[in-house]
A protein has these predicted regions:
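Histone-fold recognition with a strong bias for associated Lys/Arg-rich disordered tails
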Residues: 1-147
């Protein structure tokens, strides 16, 4: 996967997910790690979107933390993307293309995570988020703008 096509903030969220995996002695980067990275790096973005969607961000964050703590621990080895995390990032790329973007922004990563079955998407769905409402909130946030290189 070419991370050069991800915005700086998206790259930071992925890097944060890698740090979380290392700090917890885990090996695979799961969607829940990516969601935690987005929550930490894109706090203003997620705050806006979750407020629009009526989501209790604190509760969602706590669920994410509990899930991360429950994952298996290992010693050694380099972190790698799990199949679900890879699928979520591919969905984010597809969503970005649909929006006419050249770069994958945090909100596209959030949509990608929502679209791939995992604990991360289950937490968002349990919080009351739907694909249609998330898409509408993203559209409102972006006001029709695209991320293209000029």
């Amino acid at each position: 996967m070419n991370f050069d096509n991800f915005t700086i903030k998206s790259q930071e969220a992925i890097q944060k997910a890698v740090e979380i995996v290392r700090n917890h002695n885990e090996q695979s980067i799961e969607p829940v790690h990516l969601l935690k990275g987005i929550l930490q790096v894109g706090e203003s973005l997620t705050s806006y979107l979750f407020q629009k969607l009526g989501v209790n961000a604190g509760l969602l964050n706590n669920q994410v933390d509990r899930e991360i703590e429950s994952l298996p621990k290992v010693n050694g080895g380099e972190p790698y993307l799990s199949r679900e995390a890879n699928d979520a990032l591919q969905k984010a790329i597809d969503y970005s293309n649909k929006l006419g973007d050249q770069f994958v922004a945090l909100e596209a990563m959030l949509m990608g995570l929502f679209l791939v079955k995992s604990p991360a998407s289950a937490f968002m769905k349990d919080a009351g988020i739907t694909e249609k409402e998330l898409g509408a909130a993203i559209d409102e946030l972006r006001k029709g703008l695209s991320l293209i290189h000029i």
